[in-house]
Amino acid sequence: MPELPEVETVRLGLEKVTVGMQIMGGEVLYPRTIAHPQSPQVFIQGLQDATFLSWMRRGKYLLSQLSFSTQQPSGWLGVHLRMTGQLLWVAQDEPVQKHTRVRLFFVNNRELRFVDQRTFGQMWWVAPTEDPKQVISGLQKLGPEPFSEEFSVDYFWESLQGRKRSIKSALLDQALVAGVGNIYADEALFMSEIRPTTACHQLQTEQVQRLRTAIIEVLSTSIGAGGTTFSDFRDLKGVNGNYGGMAWVYGRQGQPCRTCGQTIERIKLVGRSTHFCPQCQPES
């Protein structure tokens, strides 16, 4: 699943090519992709003639504020890529990919396509009279952004106190911190020398400080590398992310640790593949 760096990479691409562009029309090829409104026709009608004012990211969600040429608000477009979703900026005469779910048309023969093999991705049109947080219910459950002041050491420490579940499990909880997923949880835990199985309540203050710093650092590094592509992620131009080749542990099971040479191990934890170095991340 695309995580914060991948979604931010897409957001940056959307900002460059769609802001100020007017939606001339569109079509929904897979109605289940549209989470709101219930009618795909109403979804397209709501977007018709609207202009993208800006794009923002909240956790793994993408949101664009829309406006008509009269400067009247025309609501919001929301997108969640889920496991395999891709937003591609292409020419309208380019052959339509097999798993294309939604097409939005612009001037100059350009088009924004939502391609999603697994069909878990979602899109929303939120009317001007509606609140995005009420319509896109997942927004209400998100914790602070990793780069925000709210994600302080004090907040992080207090949130982990008393929890007996593993720190890896906690990091996957979007209510704790928004946008971190399986890849960057493993990477940040390696960088902070914490075994993924360590219970939250066993962590010392300095470990929590190191982990917070590592989360921010690895997310920033991956954004700079255009995200990670291990399977489906592509940026707006269809280009793979480059962080995978830099990864410390994720996807490197059976290979030597870049720091100590010990073999990277992979286990299942809370149903997710979890990677770590037994030497650099000793058991508590």
From Swiss-Prot:
Record GO terms (molecular function): 8-oxo-7,8-dihydroguanine DNA N-glycosylase activity; class I DNA-(apurinic or apyrimidinic site) endonuclease activity; damaged DNA binding; zinc ion binding
Cofactor notes: Binds 1 zinc ion per subunit.
Keyword Membrane applies: no
Reactions catalysed, as given in the entry: Hydrolysis of DNA containing ring-opened 7-methylguanine residues, releasing 2,6-diamino-4-hydroxy-5-(N-methyl)formamidopyrimidine; 2'-deoxyribonucleotide-(2'-deoxyribose 5'-phosphate)-2'-deoxyribonucleotide-DNA = a 3'-end 2'-deoxyribonucleotide-(2,3-dehydro-2,3-deoxyribose 5'-phosphate)-DNA + a 5'-end 5'-phospho-2'-deoxyribonucleoside-DNA + H(+)
Residues noted as binding DNA in the record, renumbered to the chain: H99, R118, R163
Catalytic residues of the enzyme: P2, E3, K60, R272
Enzyme Commission numbers on file: 3.2.2.23, 4.2.99.18
UniProt xrefs under InterPro entries: DNA_glyclase/AP_lyase_DNA-bd, DNA_glyclase_Znf_dom_DNA_BS, Formamido-pyr_DNA_Glyclase, FPG_cat, MutM-like_N-ter, Ribosomal_uS13-like_H2TH, Znf_DNA_glyclase/AP_lyase, Znf_FPG/IleRS
SUPFAM superfamilies assigned to the protein according to its UniProt record, in alphabetical order: Glucocorticoid receptor-like (DNA-binding domain), N-terminal domain of MutM-like DNA repair proteins, S13-like H2TH domain
This protein's record includes keyword Zinc: yes
Gene3D superfamilies: 1.10.8.50, MutM-like, N-terminal
Annotated zinc fingers (FPG-type), start-end: 248-282
Annotated keywords: DNA damage, DNA repair, DNA-binding, Glycosidase, Hydrolase, Lyase, Metal-binding, Multifunctional enzyme, Zinc, Zinc-finger
Family matches, as Pfam families: Fapy_DNA_glyco, H2TH, zf-FPG_IleRS
Family: Belongs to the FPG family.
Known role: Involved in base excision repair of DNA damaged by oxidation or by mutagenic agents. Acts as a DNA glycosylase that recognizes and removes damaged bases. Has a preference for oxidized purines, such as 7,8-dihydro-8-oxoguanine (8-oxoG). Has AP (apurinic/apyrimidinic) lyase activity and introduces nicks in the DNA strand. Cleaves the DNA backbone by beta-delta elimination to generate a single-strand break at the site of the removed base with both 3'- and 5'-phosphates.
Quaternary structure note: Monomer.
Protein name: Formamidopyrimidine-DNA glycosylase
The organism of origin for this protein: Acaryochloris marina (strain MBIC 11017)
